[in-house]
């Protein structure tokens, strides 16, 4: 029997809002629109699997 190691293929991202420079964590495969908690700008939109990130990615969290 072959055992397959599954890696987590989705990650959390720390992004910076281009308007107010607030940093927050978003899921790479977000299924809903993610807005900045400070100014309300859209940071990520769902796009058939992976989200379309509209902010600067600061770090990939493990």
UniProtKB/Swiss-Prot annotation:
Q: How is the cofactor bound?
A: Binds 1 zinc ion per subunit.
Q: Which residues bind Zn(2+)?
A: 17, 20, 36, 39
Q: A cellular component term (GO) from this record?
A: ribosome
CC cofactor:
Zn(2+)
Q: Which NCBIfam families match?
A: PRK00415.1
Family membership noted in the UniProt record: Belongs to the eukaryotic ribosomal protein eS27 family.
What's this protein's name?
Small ribosomal subunit protein eS27
Taxonomic classification: Archaea, Methanobacteriati, Methanobacteriota, Stenosarchaea group, Methanomicrobia
Gene symbol here is: rps27e
């Amino acid at each position: 029997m072959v055992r397959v190691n599954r890696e987590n293929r989705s990650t959390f991202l720390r992004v910076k809002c281009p308007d107010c420079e607030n940093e927050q964590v978003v899921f790479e495969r977000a299924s809903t629109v993610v807005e900045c908690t400070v100014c309300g700008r859209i940071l990520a939109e769902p796009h058939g699997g992976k989200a379309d990130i509209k902010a600067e990615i600061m770090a990939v969290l493990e």
